[in-house]
Amino acid sequence: MAKQIKGVLGKKLGMTQVFDADNRMVPVTVVEAGPCVVTRVRTPEKDGYSAVQLGFGQIDPRKVNKPLGDYLRKHEITPRRYFTEIRTDDASEYTIGQEVLADTFEAGQFVDVTGKSKGKGFAGVMKRHGFGGLGASHGT
């Protein structure tokens, strides 16, 4: 059996709360994890290190640049919005086009998450620090 990758790409859907065994309310994050597809396999013989590149999320094929689009068409992979490379011990166990699902993790397992925040651009102090401002009437 192939050794599973301990990582998948996902999207935060929101927050909710659950009760633990002691009836305490615990905040939890809901994440749509996968399905990811293997888009590239790096081997020590060819690339000098062992890794697997994963793709996640759908994107309109017209928005993909020409070199990446040609590579994905050549390997019959639908275009993906996000790509990341995950190092692994033996990348030769994976094939291009193979799906990696969220069953990599067990229920209740703690995971490390790396995120990318939404950019808000250059903002003034009211938006940046959440100031409410004063009443908008005459004299103030």
UniProtKB/Swiss-Prot annotation:
Keywords: Ribonucleoprotein, Ribosomal protein, RNA-binding, rRNA-binding. GO terms for molecular function: rRNA binding; structural constituent of ribosome. The keyword tRNA processing does not apply. GO terms for biological process: translation. GO terms for cellular component: cytosolic large ribosomal subunit. Pfam families: Ribosomal_L3. One of the primary rRNA binding proteins, it binds directly near the 3'-end of the 23S rRNA, where it nucleates assembly of the 50S subunit. Part of the 50S ribosomal subunit. Forms a cluster with proteins L14 and L19. Belongs to the universal ribosomal protein uL3 family. This is Large ribosomal subunit protein uL3. It comes from Planobispora rosea. The lineage of its organism: Bacteria, Bacillati, Actinomycetota, Actinomycetes, Streptosporangiales.
